[in-house]
Amino acid sequence: MSGRGKGGKGLGKGGAKRHRKILRDNIQGITKPAIRRLARRGGVKRISGLIYEETRGVLKIFLENVIRDSVTYTEHAKRKTVTALDVVYALKRSGRTLYGFGA
């Protein structure tokens, strides 16, 4: 692993991350029209106004769980990059098998 930045695998202390943007309230980036399109794809004709916040909440919890499992797989493999396979395995673990991304 020579010539790969901060000392290769496990060496060095790792520097402070510069310009790390503070992430907050990004769930609002899932816009009302985006939720509406997803509902249309699922066959929904008419949507209550209260659905949007509820959908954002449910989506946030779902993504937190999948990402947590994906990162666990990544850390176990001693990698720093989450791969598509990590996500596939995390989804499979939660009972939602996804085809088309390997394994």
UniProtKB/Swiss-Prot annotation:
Modification type N6-glutaryllysine: residues: K92
Q: Where is this region: Disordered?
A: 1-20
Summary of the function given for this chain in its UniProt record: Core component of nucleosome. Nucleosomes wrap and compact DNA into chromatin, limiting DNA accessibility to the cellular machineries which require DNA as a template. Histones thereby play a central role in transcription regulation, DNA repair, DNA replication and chromosomal stability. DNA accessibility is regulated via a complex set of post-translational modifications of histones, also called histone code, and nucleosome remodeling.
Q: List the keywords (alphabetical).
A: Acetylation, Chromosome, DNA-binding, Methylation, Nucleosome core, Nucleus
Q: Where in the cell is it found?
A: Nucleus; Chromosome
Q: Which residues carry this modification: N6-methyllysine?
A: K6, K9, K13
Please list the residues that carry the modification N6-acetyl-N6-methyllysine.
Answer: K6, K13
Give the gene that encodes this protein. H4.1
Q: Which SMART domains match?
A: H4 (SM00417)
Residue ranges, compositional bias (Gly residues): 1-14
GO MF terms held by the record? DNA binding; protein heterodimerization activity; structural constituent of chromatin
Domain of life assignment: Eukaryota
- Relate the assembly described in the record: The nucleosome is a histone octamer containing two molecules each of H2A, H2B, H3 and H4 assembled in one H3-H4 heterotetramer and two H2A-H2B heterodimers. The octamer wraps approximately 147 bp of DNA.
Q: Where this protein primarily resides, as one coarse class?
A: nucleus
Q: What is this protein called in UniProt?
A: Histone H4
